[in-house]
């Protein structure tokens, strides 16, 4: 009988929701498309981001040590908090050409951890930030091969029609963003929200593959309910956010 596979430690990572208000109302978020040569979800649309590097801890940010830790709800050390903010800004520059001179302008939006069953795992902090005035993001044609501004609700509609490939955390994040009507609303909510690490749990529930999130009655550990707690696979193999049963 084979021994159970050891759980792979997650790699620290950061991703950024670059936001801009639209002249006709509402707002858009910038997304990039993975290369078809990518080892994970080739062709999927994602938010700019990547792994935290050791040298990220050496770069300054305009926040005190106390403010840094508060930004992450006390979940990270000062050095790790700084590394994640700097990594977020660096990845945006590398993938889109947009320079965020002050990483402290970004606020924590969510925190996702790849399930333990996966062989490649990431511990990713999602940040929300306003696109600098007059910035013109693009894509590097290497790691990402296309890019576009999308209304969150429109992106969800395109996903539902099979026109857009999204990973579950990206889908859930777009669903979360679609609740707001402006960049100010998103950033105000990010400043005020209590972020809990989301480590999805895959189960078959009532004959459907289901992703359980913290707060769900079937989730393996007790956590506060911060929103819908289930993402259920529907027709065409696409995921849909649903509220957990009472």
For each feature predicted by the language model, list its residue ranges:
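N-terminal leader/linker segments that precede catalytic domains of diphosphate-processing enzymes
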Residues: 1-246
């Amino acid at each position: 009988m084979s021994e159970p596979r050891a759980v792979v430690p997650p790699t620290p990572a950061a991703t950024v929701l670059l936001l801009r208000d639209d002249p006709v109302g509402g707002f858009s978020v910038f997304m990039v498309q993975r290369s078809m040569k990518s080892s994970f979800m080739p062709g999927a649309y994602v938010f700019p981001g990547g792994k935290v590097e050791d040298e990220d801890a050496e770069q300054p940010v305009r926040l005190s040590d106390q403010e840094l830790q508060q930004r992450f709800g006390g979940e990270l050390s000062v050095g790790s908090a700084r590394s994640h903010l700097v990594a977020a800004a660096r990845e945006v520059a590398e993938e889109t050409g947009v320079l965020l001179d002050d990483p402290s302008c970004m606020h924590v939006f969510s925190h996702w951890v790849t399930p333990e069953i996966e062989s490649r795992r990431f511990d990713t902090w999602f940040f929300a930030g306003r696109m600098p005035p007059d910035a013109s993001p693009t894509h590097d044609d290497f790691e990402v091969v296309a890019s576009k501004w999308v209304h969150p609700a429109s992106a969800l509609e395109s996903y539902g029609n099979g026109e857009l490939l999204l990973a579950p955390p990206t889908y859930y994040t777009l669903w979360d963003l679609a609740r707001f009507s402006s960049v100010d609303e998103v950033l105000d909510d990010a400043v005020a929200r209590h972020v809990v690490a989301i480590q999805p749990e895959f189960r078959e529930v009532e004959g459907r593959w289901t992703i359980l999130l913290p707060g769900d009655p079937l989730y393996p550990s007790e956590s506060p309910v911060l929103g819908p707690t289930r993402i259920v696979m529907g027709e065409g193999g696409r995921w849909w956010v649903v509220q957990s049963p009472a």
